[in-house]
Amino acid sequence: MEIKKIHQDFSVCKVMDYSLVNLNAEYSFIGKTDEEKSLVCVTSDVPPNVIQRDDGWKGFRVQGILDFSLIGILSKIAEILAKNSISIFVISTYNTDYVLIKKENYQKALDILE
């Protein structure tokens, strides 16, 4: 498994609506349920209509396209980091998984996973 560091800082947000979200930004993950509208984006791209936000996240992605039949990649990462008391925030796309970690634990997490 190869991981690729993402150099930008991320924010996890709750937004009123998506009207001010820049969907052309390099990273923009949105999630909508019956209870909330969420956005994860580069901190400098956070729109002004946020209700709540949590800054200070760094991330990496599992490099390459992950076939849906692959089992256990994300659980292995989560297990290794949990054993070292590092919490994660995960976003999955069609191709791969993105793992966000608070800045203060980011380098430690990378060192552990190498």
Segments from the language model and where they lie:
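Regulatory modules associated with amino-acid/nitrogen control
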Residues: 1-80, 84, 108-114
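C-terminal structural segments of small proteins and small subunits
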Residues: 87-94, 101
